[in-house]
């Protein structure tokens, strides 16, 4: 048979042609017939590294198939066979661990608590299975027909991450450039492996005993860590049928993959994410409906976590989408508008006002020590940094930097350690965004002594781009290795790398705190600070022609208090507290008249940062003005009482009136009793 004929599509090859090919292969030791047919289309499976002297190749058309067992690697030199070995119908059987006794099984997994309830309310959307079926192909398992619900892939030269969701089916492939691939299949039906004749027909791929689903893990047992990883991921789907518990575990696994780069963390996080999506799709498919907020949550988390994982592997890629546009058609609640805009890459212009209001409200609550929505803040910052003007971006970073206090950074570090603990109970939902926001999207770097938070911050800033934006989910061979621009650095390019903390001003300059004097800009050396940790405050800008190299000392002053209720004298100034140990304690942007009055109230202030009685004697204060002036703040010339609300005045008046009434009633009772008693006494004597 001519060599060119073997390159024809298999659907054109007849049964006689295949038999002729088998007879022409002198090295063939047998051609057992039967078995499932060859896949018709789909991506070519990647051949794994050869590990033995025997090759198995599957060829066939829609009606018949054959497995040829070739005697050795020398068969590759046969041009009549090479066309099939290098073609799309090659099936490599090198992923099955020899011997069979090396297959691994897991015990019953630890069940996780349920965090979400059944879908209810008016925000339900239909979730029906599609009528189109597709052939799912793999390297070691016979092809399966699957009704596909979702299909997503992130790919670059450094890594590939593919997820296929179907009716009671999950196919997941993960491969890294520097490590062996891993494949996980979850199916309600028993799968059959393409096995050597010696192992017999109908052999299941390796995996644990079947529970609600059959779980198969295919990969190379390269070392003990890989063996343990394959055992662990096989148990994920049976831990919980609650999508929110699985998503929480996926966020924790992604956190581990970002802060502890390595193939095993990457594999665990990828499988966690795939299993979370599978559990959600199965519940929605069975109910034929899904909660719109839940569908949006799964879609946005899949895009966010896939991007963070691929960034950890060295790729700027992430999932472009998961549920084939289903999520884009769901009604969006007002609280989820920023999440939806980020997820689908919508035109951000209609959402910019909402983003500004979200950042402002989070800042107001943060200054007063109240909790705020950290996830909404992340999406608001993402929109403002990417689509807002230069003023929006700089003002946003000024606020997030002020919100990033030492206490909040410590809380994020503690939350990270708890999430990374193997004993994490997941009694409540966990999201990576609760760790990332606001410190990871701020200009505060002096709290990054923990490498965990530093790695998270770098990953978070590169994940700020809208997930649906062009180029956010794909990478070419030429551009995959290029670093994506950091939107935080783009908003304030004048800030030097050694800055501990930066406060951007509207005019293109920034106040920066460093340990040594910057190359350009007027610098203030702060006195009374430990010489081992000196603090230098400088005003830097991109205008090199106006560079000022003067060294100064901040002037100590008693600033005048203002009595004008309609003019905010100190608005847009930044109040800073630092300690003699060289630590920046907090920064506060004065943005309103109310905050100005609280600042001048001194010990009567209800804002903790302004109240001097809450800080020790080694703590000093600075006032930074928008024009670049720096003042060592001693006090205000007069102490103003904190403003009293009208409700308090009304309550005080009512309380005083009630008190007077009670006293009057008591007085009348006493007088009446005395008068009546004397009258009786006089009458008795008479």
From Swiss-Prot:
Keywords: Fusion of virus membrane with host cell membrane, Fusion of virus membrane with host membrane, Glycoprotein, Host cell membrane, Host endosome, Host membrane, Membrane, Sialic acid, Signal, Transmembrane, Transmembrane helix, Viral envelope protein, Viral penetration into host cytoplasm, Virion, Virus entry into host cell. Residues 157-217 are annotated as: Interaction with gL. Residues 668-686 are intravirion. GO terms for cellular component: host cell endosome membrane; host cell plasma membrane; membrane; viral envelope; virion membrane. One of its GO terms (biological process) is symbiont entry into host cell. Glycans are attached at residues 77, 162, 542, 604, 627. Residues 25-646 are virion surface. This is Envelope glycoprotein H. It comes from Suid herpesvirus 1 (strain Rice) (SuHV-1). The gene is gH.
């Amino acid at each position: 048979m001519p060599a060119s004929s073997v390159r024809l599509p298999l659907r054109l090859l007849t049964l006689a042609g295949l038999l002729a090919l088998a007879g022409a292969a002198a090295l063939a030791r047998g051609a057992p017939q039967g078995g499932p047919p060859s896949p018709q289309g789909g991506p070519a499976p990647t051949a794994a590294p050869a590990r033995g002297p025997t090759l198995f190749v599957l060829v066939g058309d829609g009606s018949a198939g054959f497995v040829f067992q070739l005697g050795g690697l020398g068969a590759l030199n046969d041009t009549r066979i090479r066309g099939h070995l290098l073609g799309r119908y090659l099936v490599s059987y090198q992923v099955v661990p020899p011997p069979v006794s090396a297959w691994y099984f897991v015990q019953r997994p630890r069940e996780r608590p349920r965090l979400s309830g059944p879908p209810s309310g008016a925000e339900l959307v239909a979730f029906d299975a599609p009528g189109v079926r597709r052939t799912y192909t793999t390297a070691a398992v016979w092809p399966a027909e699957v009704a596909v619900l979702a299909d997503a892939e992130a790919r670059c030269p450094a890594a590939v991450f593919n997820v296929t969701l179907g009716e009671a089916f999950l196919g997941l492939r993960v491969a890294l450039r520097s490590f062996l691939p891993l494949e996980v299949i979850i199916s309600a039906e028993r799968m059959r492996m393409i096995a050597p004749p010696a192992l017999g027909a109908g052999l299941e791929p390796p995996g644990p005993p079947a529970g609600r689903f059959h779980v198969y893990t295919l990969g190379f047992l390269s070392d003990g860590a890989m063996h343990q990883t394959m055992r662990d991921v096989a148990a994920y789907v049976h831990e919980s049928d609650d999508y929110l518990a699985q998503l929480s575990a996926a966020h924790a696994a992604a956190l581990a993959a970002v802060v502890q780069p390595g193939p095993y963390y990457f594999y665990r996080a990828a499988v966690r994410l795939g299993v979370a999506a599978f559990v959600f799709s199965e519940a929605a498919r069975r109910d034929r409906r899904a909660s719109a907020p839940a569908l949006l949550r799964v879609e946005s988390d899949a895009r966010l976590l896939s991007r963070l994982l691929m960034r950890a592997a060295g790729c700027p890629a992430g999932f472009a989408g998961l549920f084939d546009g289903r999520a884009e058609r769901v009604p969006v609640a007002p609280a989820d508008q920023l999440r939806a805009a980020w997820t689908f890459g919508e035109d951000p212009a209609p959402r910019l006002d909402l983003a500004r209001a979200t950042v402002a409200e989070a800042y107001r609550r943060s200054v007063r020590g109240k909790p705020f929505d950290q996830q909404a803040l992340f999406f608001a910052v993402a929109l403002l940094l990417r689509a807002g003007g230069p003023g929006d971006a700089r003002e946003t970073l000024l606020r997030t930097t002020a919100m990033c206090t030492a206490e909040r950074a410590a809380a994020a570090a503690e939350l990270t350690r708890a999430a990374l603990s193997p004993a994490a109970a997941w009694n409540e939902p966990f999201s990576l965004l609760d760790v990332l926001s606001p410190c990871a999207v701020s200009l505060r770097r002096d709290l990054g002594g923990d490498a965990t938070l530093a790695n998270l911050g770098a990953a978070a800033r590169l994940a700020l781009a809208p997930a649906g934006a062009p180029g956010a989910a794909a990478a070419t061979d030429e551009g995959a290795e290029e670093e994506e621009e950091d939107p935080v650095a783009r908003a304030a390019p004048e800030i030097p790398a050694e800055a501990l903390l930066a406060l951007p001003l509207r005019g293109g300059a920034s106040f920066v705190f460093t340990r040594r004097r910057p190359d350009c800009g007027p610098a203030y050396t702060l006195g009374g600070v430990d010489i081992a940790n000196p603090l230098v405050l400088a005003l830097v800008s991109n205008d090199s022609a106006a560079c000022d190299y003067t060294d100064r000392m901040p002037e100590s002053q008693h600033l005048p208090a203002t009595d004008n209720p309609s003019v905010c004298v100190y608005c847009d100034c930044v109040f800073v507290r630092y300690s003699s140990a060289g630590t920046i304690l907090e920064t506060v942007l004065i943005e309103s008249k109310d905050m100005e009055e609280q600042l001048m109230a001194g010990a009567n202030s209800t804002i903790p940062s302004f109240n001097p009685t809450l800080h020790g004697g080694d703590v000093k204060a600075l006032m930074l003005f928008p024009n670049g002036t720096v003042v060592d703040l001693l006090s205000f010339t007069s102490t103003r009482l904190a403003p009293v609300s009208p409700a308090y005045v009304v309550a005080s008046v009512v309380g005083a009136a009630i008190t007077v009434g009670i006293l009057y009633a008591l007085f009348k009772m006493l007088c009446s009793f005395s008068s009546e008693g004397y009258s009786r006494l006089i009458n008795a004597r008479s």
